[in-house]
Amino acid sequence: MLRIAVTGSPGVGKSTVVAKTAEKLAEKPGFKIGGIRTAEIRKEGHREGFSIRDLATGKTGILSHVKGSGPRLGKYHVNLDDLERIGANAVRNALACDLVVIDEIGPMELISQSFVSAVEEVLESDKPVLAVLHHSSRHPLAQRFRKGFEVLTVDKGNRDELPEKITNRFLRKLG
């Protein structure tokens, strides 16, 4: 079973690598991708938070925002409702798909025990996984990814070629 996690500095393109890889794999007829993707929420050039999207259903919510009432992490408030309703459910439901995508295993997501439990269910399965791993997280779940996954570091020199390389690895392994 192929399990790849990409890591690297903030803003280097980890989520973009995973998104481009998932898009390429989704072109394969009958190939189902499930899981989550996060993206920046920007206003007037400033990052105000992050959205979270269920890759299978397209359902979108707010993961975190500068304005909010959830647990605070840096300048953001984590929206536990959307993280659990959309994020944790998307990860659990992805067990019925051909590939589980998790963007990201990072401090915001790891605040939710429901999300952590959903990811642990995936790790206990035999499903192929493609994940974004926060570069410095010391959470026990992040450590499991570092030990059990092939970890690729994204940088400006390889970020354009990685989606194709990762796609080809999954296609060879999954037939």
From Swiss-Prot:
* Documented EC number(s): 3.6.1.15
Q: Which domain of life is it from?
A: Archaea
Sample GO molecular function, one term: ATP binding
Spell out the Pfam families in the cross-references. NTPase_1
**Residues holding ATP:** 8-15, 99-106
Catalytic function, reaction form: a ribonucleoside 5'-triphosphate + H2O = a ribonucleoside 5'-diphosphate + phosphate + H(+)
Top enzyme class of this protein?
hydrolase
Q: What does the UniProt keyword field contain?
A: ATP-binding, Hydrolase, Nucleotide-binding
InterPro entries in the record? Nuc-triphosphatase_THEP1, P-loop_NTPase
**Cross-referenced CDD domains, in alphabetical order?**
RecA-like_Thep1 (cd19482)
Any keyword Lyase? no
Gene3D superfamilies named in the record: P-loop containing nucleotide triphosphate hydrolases (3.40.50.300)
PANTHER family in alphabetical order: CANCER-RELATED NUCLEOSIDE-TRIPHOSPHATASE
Similarity comment text for this entry: Belongs to the THEP1 NTPase family.
The UniProt function text for this chain reads:
Has nucleotide phosphatase activity towards ATP, GTP, CTP, TTP and UTP. May hydrolyze nucleoside diphosphates with lower efficiency.
Known NCBIfam families for this protein?
Answer: PRK13695.1 (NF010248)
Name this protein carries in UniProt? Nucleoside-triphosphatase THEP1
Source species of the chain? Methanosarcina acetivorans (strain ATCC 35395 / DSM 2834 / JCM 12185 / C2A)
